[in-house]
């Protein structure tokens, strides 16, 4: 039976302590809050207005076929963008200094079909603690179709996983909305990690959000535009969103240079938690302002994993501090200059996992 490991820092590194001191000093010296600002709130409102406007136009005004497909593609992109920029920061409590608005931002994902509650358990508690640890980190548990790390069992089909993976990635949101949320809900755990005890309100919110989504995204559109038109539009939206979400999240951890640490015999991880995060995480395209704006700073994954409660709008600034500290402590800082470089590395990693 797999149990959750402990981070022991057997080398006695002071890296994390020193890094926290330097980053905290940056905010104190510059008199800046660690949460979001007007630019983030403007982006959140912009994305939601665009999404709602497109939904109304597609469902109630029934534009032509190709126009509708184009708008569904845009809605798929906006679904991912809202997840990256609004829900993600809100879920980590970094969207605002107000707990109320952080809750609103975090649970906005419910309107997009996913459960904010299940996401919080899967992402904040499991993934951010046990990153890239096989058998615990749910983000690399895509068995048996994909072999993401060397300790997972290999099948013949994995020889081709670097080819068919892109189709599987398009299914992420569909599986998330219709299957994985329910698996976690009824099993009351994420992998081997138990869910936090759900309150009566949590149960009510889970089912209300699911029913509301099914009505708004399935029942009402079918009534308005007929089944076939709805099916095409729904698949275009969800598959495009799934592809974007999958690629951005996988480029952060499953590339050639990231590690997949295995606990020692006593079930300890030899490094302190912060060093573990850097060894298992990679950045990409950090100089590309458009990508950074669209993906909510998730191309700065090292910064995010080290300081998840700091809003992504601050990642470019604190990345300089983190790089410098990594250099001083001789810790490799993994970064791909362009997004295409990270995509190639991810593809080569999957190809290697299918052959070794």
Regions found by a protein language model. Name each.
Residues 20, 24-42:
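Membrane-interface, cytosolic juxtamembrane amphipathic helix immediately N-terminal to a transmembrane helix
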Residues 237-250, 254-255, 322-332:
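C-terminal, active-site-flanking charged/polar segments
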Residues 4-6, 32-39, 90, 105-110, ...:
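Glycine- and acidic
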Residues 35-83, 110-111, 160-174, 197-248:
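Alpha-helical bilayer-embedded segments of polytopic membrane proteins, i.e.
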Residues 74-198, 265-354:
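Membrane-embedded catalytic scaffold of the fatty acid hydroxylase/desaturase
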Residues 62, 90-95, 184-187, 224, ...:
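Membrane-interfacial segments
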Residues 2-25, 171-186:
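Short, charged cytosolic
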Residues 249-273:
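C-terminal, non-catalytic macromolecule-binding modules
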């Amino acid at each position: 039976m797999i149990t959750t490991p402990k981070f022991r820092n057997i080398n006695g590194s002071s890296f994390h302590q020193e890094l926290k001191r330097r980053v905290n000093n940056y905010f104190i010296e510059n008199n800046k809050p660690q949460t979001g600002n007007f630019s983030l709130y403007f982006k959140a409102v912009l994305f939601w207005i665009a999404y709602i406007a497109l939904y109304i136009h597609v469902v109630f005004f029934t534009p032509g076929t190709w126009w509708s497909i184009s708008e569904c593609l845009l809605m798929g992109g906006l679904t991912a963008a809202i997840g990256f920029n609004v829900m993600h920061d809100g879920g980590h409590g970094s969207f605002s200094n107000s707990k109320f608005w952080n809750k609103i931002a975090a649970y906005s994902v419910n309107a997009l079909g996913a459960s904010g509650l299940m996401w919080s358990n899967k992402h904040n508690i499991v993934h951010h603690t046990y990153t890239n640890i096989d058998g615990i980190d749910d983000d690399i548990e895509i068995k048996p179709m994909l072999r993401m790390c060397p300790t997972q069992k290999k099948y013949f089909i994995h020889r081709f996983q670097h080819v068919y993976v892109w189709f599987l990635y398009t299914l992420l949101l569909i599986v998330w909305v219709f299957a994985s949320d329910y698996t976690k809900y009824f099993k009351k755990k994420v992998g081997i990690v138990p869910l936090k005890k759900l309150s009566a309100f949590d149960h009510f919110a889970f089912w209300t959000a699911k029913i509301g989504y099914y009505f708004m995204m399935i029942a009402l559109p079918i009534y308005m535009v007929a089944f076939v038109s709805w099916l095409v539009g729904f698949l275009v939206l969800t598959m495009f969103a799934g592809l974007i979400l999958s690629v951005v999240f996988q480029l952060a951890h499953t590339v050639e240079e990231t590690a997949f640490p295995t606990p020692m015999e006593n079930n300890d991880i030899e490094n302190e938690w912060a060093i573990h995060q850097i060894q298992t995480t990679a950045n990409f395209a950090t100089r590309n302002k458009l990508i950074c704006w669209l993906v909510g700073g998730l191309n700065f994954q090292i910064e995010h994993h080290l300081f998840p409660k700091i809003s992504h709008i601050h990642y470019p600034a604190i990345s300089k501090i983190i790089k410098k500290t990594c250099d001083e402590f001789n810790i490799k800082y993994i970064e791909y200059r362009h997004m295409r470089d990270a995509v190639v590395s991810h593809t080569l990693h999957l190809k290697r996992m299918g052959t070794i």
